[in-house]
């Protein structure tokens, strides 16, 4: 700043244009602000008309409560709002808008016309303003009860801003995404969109489970609903409900992720971290989960006044929210079994309402307890094939998950039976029961293909199983259970490693000393900015302890929790499971294949191997008929 410059007040027009830089980024930003105002007014139907991606025209019309003639000029003034009056109102605000900046910012960079009528008024009133003229003009108009806002020629008076706009299709795609998010947030409101005179979207009000599921399917695609798991869990004043996509319906981009807090669409790093943790064990590298989730909590438990766009929020009890989200999603994904994936997609599947440990109640990090109840399967007669023949070590029966976890050594010993050479004399094949109700979800084995795949028949048709991937997941889950039950043993270091940290990091390490100790670490503070690592988990003796502790402390300060140590341990267990699992070209007898299928049905996350690859797939009779043109 030059020495001769004097401090002076900015003109209202310039101040609004500066504010518009934060609030109005593109036509989608305008649509968001106008639609939120319509929803706050109690509208039950909103019509959106767009031309040229929203740059030439963006018109939003609703049937809400309307604005009185006396309030129309104030509606375009900065920091004028009907949503809050006192600071206490801000702490518990439930409306989508409350800052009183949107219309003033929009009118400073576009030609804006607002027409409104209340139920008690005999006629409607209209106010107009343009970017170069901030003085509003009020006049009578014809309009039903409700409000229409027409925004023309966006950024007409700021050519530099207009140059940064993308192609018409790109801008319209962003605008559509805003409408989709709000349509998911408010099932009780109808949304109707037209672009360049063509109807693009028509969503009617959805007041029941079937209608809500249809709306989600219309927005996210029918494939999502076919591969989605409904959840509804409530605990300690927090409720999470919605739909989470199965790992088999992952995406290459994070473009099908919708998260709402008290009806407000948000993008929050704490939420993203919790979801990423929950899916970490089942997603293939580089893939992203899909979900439509709604978190409900007391309004004073979340601060929405963090950013002008209100996309970011701050939770008062961030650690509790994180653990609740992670635990709920982790448990829901773990409880998915083959029969859940085989079930025909209903209009509204039964909601999953787990309780206790199934509701996401976990012990301290590193001591996660897997649920012990078993999926009840119809029991077939227990025919034993463990007669020293090719099926030695296995029994052909339903094998529920053990109520007491197996020790790691025993779990591995059992599966070493896979490596025993096959003896001559084939075991008897199993015929399918006459009643389809007696057929287990993955059916009964028919044959083995190229020593890699198991072919089985179930009530739906043909099941193909990657035996190595499936066996790998079974061993991995049993090793995790064994480790959780036996605890983590520590390995003292002959020469303790010193670690230079900031004072804040050292304080964090001291605060979480017991947490580290449960995971096999022993940390000692030597000074204000120095730690000594005296012991590490025995399984991690090859790991870089310094870097791992630093990364964990960074997570603890950012999210209040960390799963890095557990992730390292799981990686080692996964390697053990991979090397211990049955290899390709290993010939299995029919009883061995059936035993593997039964174990898959009773193993958590059996649909994916440790690396996120699918372990099995289903081909129905309809799919097979299409291959051979049957029925045409």
UniProtKB/Swiss-Prot annotation:
<dbReference type="InterPro" id="IPR014790">
    <property type="entry name" value="MutL_C"/>
</dbReference>
<dbReference type="InterPro" id="IPR020667">
    <property type="entry name" value="DNA_mismatch_repair_MutL"/>
</dbReference>
<dbReference type="InterPro" id="IPR002099">
    <property type="entry name" value="MutL/Mlh/PMS"/>
</dbReference>
<comment type="function">
    <text>This protein is involved in the repair of mismatches in DNA. It is required for dam-dependent methyl-directed DNA mismatch repair. May act as a 'molecular matchmaker', a protein that promotes the formation of a stable complex between two or more DNA-binding proteins in an ATP-dependent manner without itself being part of a final effector complex.</text>
</comment>
<keyword id="KW-0227">DNA damage</keyword>
<dbReference type="InterPro" id="IPR038973">
    <property type="entry name" value="MutL/Mlh/Pms-like"/>
</dbReference>
<dbReference type="Pfam" id="PF01119">
    <property type="entry name" value="DNA_mis_repair"/>
</dbReference>
<dbReference type="InterPro" id="IPR037198">
    <property type="entry name" value="MutL_C_sf"/>
</dbReference>
<dbReference type="Pfam" id="PF13589">
    <property type="entry name" value="HATPase_c_3"/>
</dbReference>
<dbReference type="InterPro" id="IPR042121">
    <property type="entry name" value="MutL_C_regsub"/>
</dbReference>
<dbReference type="GO" id="GO:0016887">
    <property type="term" value="F:ATP hydrolysis activity"/>
</dbReference>
<dbReference type="InterPro" id="IPR020568">
    <property type="entry name" value="Ribosomal_Su5_D2-typ_SF"/>
</dbReference>
<dbReference type="InterPro" id="IPR014721">
    <property type="entry name" value="Ribsml_uS5_D2-typ_fold_subgr"/>
</dbReference>
<dbReference type="GO" id="GO:0140664">
    <property type="term" value="F:ATP-dependent DNA damage sensor activity"/>
</dbReference>
<keyword id="KW-0234">DNA repair</keyword>
<dbReference type="InterPro" id="IPR042120">
    <property type="entry name" value="MutL_C_dimsub"/>
</dbReference>
<dbReference type="GO" id="GO:0005524">
    <property type="term" value="F:ATP binding"/>
</dbReference>
<dbReference type="InterPro" id="IPR014762">
    <property type="entry name" value="DNA_mismatch_repair_CS"/>
</dbReference>
<dbReference type="GO" id="GO:0032300">
    <property type="term" value="C:mismatch repair complex"/>
</dbReference>
<dbReference type="Pfam" id="PF08676">
    <property type="entry name" value="MutL_C"/>
</dbReference>
<dbReference type="InterPro" id="IPR036890">
    <property type="entry name" value="HATPase_C_sf"/>
</dbReference>
<dbReference type="GO" id="GO:0030983">
    <property type="term" value="F:mismatched DNA binding"/>
</dbReference>
<dbReference type="GO" id="GO:0006298">
    <property type="term" value="P:mismatch repair"/>
</dbReference>
<comment type="similarity">
    <text>Belongs to the DNA mismatch repair MutL/HexB family.</text>
</comment>
<dbReference type="InterPro" id="IPR013507">
    <property type="entry name" value="DNA_mismatch_S5_2-like"/>
</dbReference>
<protein>
    <recommendedName>
        <fullName>DNA mismatch repair protein MutL</fullName>
    </recommendedName>
</protein>
């Amino acid at each position: 700043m030059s020495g001769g410059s004097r401090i002076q007040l900015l003109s209202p027009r310039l101040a609004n244009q500066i504010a518009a830089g934060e609030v109005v980024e593109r036509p989608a930003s305008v649509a968001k602000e106008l639609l939120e105002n319509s929803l706050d007014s109690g509208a039950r139907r909103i019509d959106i008309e767009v031309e040229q991606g929203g740059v030439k025209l963006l018109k939003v019309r609703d049937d809400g409560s309307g604005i009185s003639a006396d309030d129309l000029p104030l509606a375009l003034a900065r920091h004028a709002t009907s949503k809050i009056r006192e600071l206490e109102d801000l702490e518990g605000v439930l409306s989508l808008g409350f800052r009183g900046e949107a219309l003033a910012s929009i009118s400073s960079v576009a030609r804006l016309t607002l027409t409104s009528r209340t139920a008690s008024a005999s006629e409607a009133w209209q106010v107009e303003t343009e970017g170069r003229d901030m003085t509003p003009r009020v006049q009578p108009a014809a309009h039903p009860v409700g409000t229409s806002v027409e925004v023309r020629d966006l950024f007409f008076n700021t050519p530099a801003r207009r140059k940064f706009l993308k192609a018409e299709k790109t801008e319209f795609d962003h605008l559509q995404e805003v409408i989709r998010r709000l349509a998911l947030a408010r099932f009780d409101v109808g949304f109707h969109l037209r672009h360049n005179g063509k109807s693009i979207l028509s969503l009617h009000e959805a007041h029941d489970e079937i209608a809500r599921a249809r709306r989600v399917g219309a927005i996210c695609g029918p494939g999502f609903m076919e591969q989605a798991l409904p959840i509804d869990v409530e605990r300690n004043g927090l409720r999470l409900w919605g739909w989470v996509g199965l790992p088999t319906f992952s995406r290459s981009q994070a473009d099908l992720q919708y998260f709402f807090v008290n009806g407000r669409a948000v993008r929050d790093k704490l939420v993203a971290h919790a979801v990423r943790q929950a899916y970490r064990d089942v997603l293939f590298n580089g893939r992203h989960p899909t979900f439509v989730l709604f978190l409900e909590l007391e309004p004073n438990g979340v601060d929405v006044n963090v950013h002008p766009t209100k996309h970011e929020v701050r939770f008062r009890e961030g650690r509790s929210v994180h653990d609740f989200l992670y635990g709920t999603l982790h448990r829901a994904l773990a409880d998915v079994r083959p029969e859940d994936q085989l079930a025909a997609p209903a209009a509204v599947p039964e909601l999953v309402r787990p309780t206790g440990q199934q509701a996401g109640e976990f012990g301290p990090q590193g001591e996660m307890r897997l649920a012990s109840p078993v999926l009840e399967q119809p029991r077939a007669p227990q025919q034993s094939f463990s007669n020293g023949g090719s099926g030695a070590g296995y029994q052909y029966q339903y094998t529920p998950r053990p109520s007491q976890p197996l020790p790691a050594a025993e779990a591995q010993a059992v599966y070493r039976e896979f490596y025993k050479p096959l003896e001559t004399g084939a075991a008897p094949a199993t015929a399918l029961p006459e009643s389809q109700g007696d057929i287990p979800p993955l059916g009964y084995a028919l044959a083995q293909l190229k020593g890699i795949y198991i072919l089985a028949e179930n009530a739906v048709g043909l099941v193909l199983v990657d035996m190595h991937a499936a066996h790998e997941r079974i061993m991995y889950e049993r090793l995790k259970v064994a480790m959780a039950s036996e605890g983590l043993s520590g390995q003292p270091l002959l020469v303790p490693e010193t670690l230079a940290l900031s004072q804040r990091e050292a304080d964090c390490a001291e605060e979480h000393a017991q947490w580290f100790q449960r995971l096999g670490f022993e940390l000692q503070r030597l000074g204000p900015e120095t730690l000594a690592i005296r012991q590490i988990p025995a399984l991690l003796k090859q790991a870089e302890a310094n870097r791992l502790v630093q990364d964990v402390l960074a997570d603890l300060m950012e999210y209040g929790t960390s799963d890095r140590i557990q992730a390292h341990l799981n990686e080692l267990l996964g390697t053990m499971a991979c090397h211990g699992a049955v290899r390709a070209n290993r010939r299995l007898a029919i009883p061995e294949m059936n035993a593997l299928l039964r174990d898959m049905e009773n193993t958590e996350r059996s649909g994916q191997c440790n690396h996120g690859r699918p372990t099995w797939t289903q081909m129905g009779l309809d799919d097979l008929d299409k291959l051979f043109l049957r029925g045409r």
